[in-house]
């Protein structure tokens, strides 16, 4: 039996959240599972602890009981799965966690060093025309060149704050308001007019274990995130998409990011989700799989073969 903890948000939903499915599979294997909120993390006189609860998955909710002061260094495995925003509070947890000598999914230093919308910059041949800035004049010039762009906050997630700018839109006013709201640079990319090609690929140990096409169902919606209601469908990966998965997977494996999700649109790499990857529930649904079992098989293998 392994002693396992999940650092995650409390508002996860049974049947809709990958973290819950991973907890459920851990329970099925007989592991002891704890939950704690990131805000309960504390470095106390040389020891990293958290106010944690034993957790079990019920029919429609998680059940927390037996509150305890959990020494994280005595765990066998820790899942770092709280959602962005990727702010200084989030970053601070990665500085504290990287002191632990246990298996973490994912490596907190790697999470910190590879923000999800910046990581694709390491693969320039795969990304669409991209601008990262908080300069309104630079965004306006980018819009003037491409005429149809997508603007999104750099450190949020799940499609939050994403907007398309085209036609006679006041790009200056929109970008200025977004910079003020998010207090961070923005990502601007040329709009890819082929949202029917949007895919989520799940990588485990740097290799793709499943993919779905994400179909937009709402009229006028450009966001294909599963969190905002896109419908998953079966798909095949093209040669270029497999090349993207291979190259990204090589990088992720080299920095101990064991579990990740890749967003591909029109043959372009858009984002790499390393904080709280989702997608396995939808792949299970479409293909009748149980990927949480494959994930746990790999995590246990990684623990067994972990270098001292």
From Swiss-Prot:
Protein family: Belongs to the prokaryotic GSH synthase family.
Gene source species: Anaplasma centrale
Origin: domain of life: Bacteria
UniProt entry keywords in alphabetical sequence: ATP-binding, Glutathione biosynthesis, Ligase, Magnesium, Manganese, Metal-binding, Nucleotide-binding
Binding residues for Mg(2+): 271, 273
Binding of ATP, residues: 143-198
Lineage of producing organism: Bacteria, Pseudomonadati, Pseudomonadota, Alphaproteobacteria, Rickettsiales
Protein name per its UniProtKB record: Glutathione synthetase
A GO molecular function held by the record: ATP binding
ATP-grasp domain residues: 117-300
Pathway: Sulfur metabolism; glutathione biosynthesis; glutathione from L-cysteine and L-glutamate: step 2/2
Cofactor note: Binds 1 Mg(2+) or Mn(2+) ion per subunit.
Name of one Pfam family that matches: GSH-S_N
GO cellular component, as recorded: cytoplasm
Entry's EC annotation: 6.3.2.3
UniProt catalytic activity: gamma-L-glutamyl-L-cysteine + glycine + ATP = glutathione + ADP + phosphate + H(+)
Cofactor: Mg(2+); Mn(2+)
Alphabetized InterPro entries for the sequence: ATP-grasp, ATP_grasp_subdomain_1, Glut_synth_pro, GSHS_ATP-bd, GSHS_N, PreATP-grasp_dom_sf
């Amino acid at each position: 039996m392994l002693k396992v903890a999940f650092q995650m948000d409390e508002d996860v939903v049974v049947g809709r959240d990958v973290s819950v499915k991973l907890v459920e599979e851990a329970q099925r294997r007989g592991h002891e599972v704890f939950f704690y909120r990131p805000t309960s993390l504390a470095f106390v006189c040389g020891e990293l602890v958290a106010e944690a609860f034993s957790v079990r998955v019920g029919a429609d909710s998680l059940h927390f009981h037996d509150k305890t002061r959990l020494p994280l260094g005595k765990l066998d495995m820790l899942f770092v799965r709280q959602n962005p925003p990727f702010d200084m509070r989030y970053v601070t947890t990665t500085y504290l966690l990287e002191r632990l000598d246990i298996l973490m999914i994912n490596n907190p230093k790697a999470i910190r060093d590879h923000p999800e919308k910046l990581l694709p910059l390491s693969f320039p041949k795969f990304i669409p025309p991209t601008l990262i800035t908080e300069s309104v004049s630079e965004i306006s010039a980018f819009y003037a060149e491409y005429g149809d762009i997508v603007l999104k906050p750099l450190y949020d997630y799940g499609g939050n704050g994403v907007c398309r700018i085209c036609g006679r839109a006041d790009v200056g006013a929109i970008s200025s308001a977004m910079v003020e709201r998010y207090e961070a640079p923005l990502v601007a990319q040329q709009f890819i007019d082929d949202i029917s090609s949007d895919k989520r690929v799940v990588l485990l140990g740097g290799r793709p274990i499943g993919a779905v096409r994400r179909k937009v169902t709402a009229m006028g919606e450009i966001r294909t995130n599963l969190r905002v209601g896109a419908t998953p469908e079966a798909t095949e990966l093209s040669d270029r998409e497999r090349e993207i998965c291979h190259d990204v997977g090589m990088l992720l494996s080299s920095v101990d990011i064991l579990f990740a999700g890749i967003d591909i649109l029109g043959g372009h790499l858009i984002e790499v989700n390393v904080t709280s990857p989702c997608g396995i529930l939808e792949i299970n649904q479409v293909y009748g799989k149980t990927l949480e079992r494959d994930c746990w098989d790999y995590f246990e293998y990684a623990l067994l073969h972990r270098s001292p």
